[in-house]
């Protein structure tokens, strides 16, 4: 059975309405309770590391996320990171370079509507993210709207559409249809053969 780590950082996916608008108030355990497909296919451990609107993510938070992934890489088959969409592509790209040689899938995902919203895209995005995290494909990826994108090639191009991200100058790593997730092996990053090296210094 696969063992997946869910790292939560806040973002719209974990947000609730407040007097000042949406705020990422939901913790990881509360988020996980709203994911109906967390079944016997894999076990999930949840860890909260941030509760931020992703527009407030700074390099210090990138370092925190990278260190958390690095510290847990040997204990899990894959890691899913929930994140706000505003800076998700930046975080995915930075992690791709900070975690060179990561031997497991690290999959960032989020949503355009909170998970408690009746029309949320969160569950579909999480389903893709967990499928990718169970795939054994090493690297950092973004899973969103039936697509899996190499982390260093993801760009947010649409502010409000569910189809928010595109892959720039690189084929999709994966796509989803009625038959499930299909991975394009030719689009995966090459395996380095050595252990992952954490490059935590950004300047």
Residue ranges and their predicted role:
Residues 73-78:
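Short acidic/histidine-rich motifs immediately flanking catalytic phosphotransfer sites
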Residues 1-70:
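ATP/NTP phosphate-donor binding region
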Residues 9-12, 83-84, 109:
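Glycine-rich beta-strand-to-loop/alpha-helix junction loops that act as flexible
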Residues 108-178:
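Internal gly/pro-rich beta-alpha loop/helix module
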Residues 2-3, 7-11, 34-38, 150-203:
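Accessory alpha-helical/coil subdomains and C-terminal extensions
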């Amino acid at each position: 059975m696969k063992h997946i780590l869910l790292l939560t950082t806040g973002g719209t996916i974990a947000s609730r309405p407040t007097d000042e608008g949406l705020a990422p108030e939901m913790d990881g355990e509360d988020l996980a309770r709203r994911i109906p497909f967390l079944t016997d296919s894999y076990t999930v451990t949840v860890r909260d590391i941030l509760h931020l609107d992703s527009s407030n993510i700074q390099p210090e938070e990138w370092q925190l996320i990278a260190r958390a992934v690095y510290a847990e890489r040997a204990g899990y088959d894959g890691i899913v990171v929930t994140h706000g969409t505003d800076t998700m592509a930046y975080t995915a790209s930075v992690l791709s370079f900070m975690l060179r040689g990561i031997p497991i899938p690290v999959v960032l995902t989020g949503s355009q509507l909170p998970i408690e919203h009746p029309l949320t895209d969160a569950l579909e995005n999480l389903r893709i993210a967990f499928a990718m995290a169970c795939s054994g494909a090493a690297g950092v990826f973004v899973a969103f709207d039936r697509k899996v994108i190499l982390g260093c090639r993801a760009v947010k191009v649409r502010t409000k559409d569910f189809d928010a991200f595109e892959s720039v100058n690189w084929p999709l790593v994966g796509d989803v249809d009625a038959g499930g997730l299909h991975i394009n092996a030719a689009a995966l990053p090459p395996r380095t053969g050595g252990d992952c090296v954490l490059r935590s210094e950004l300047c």
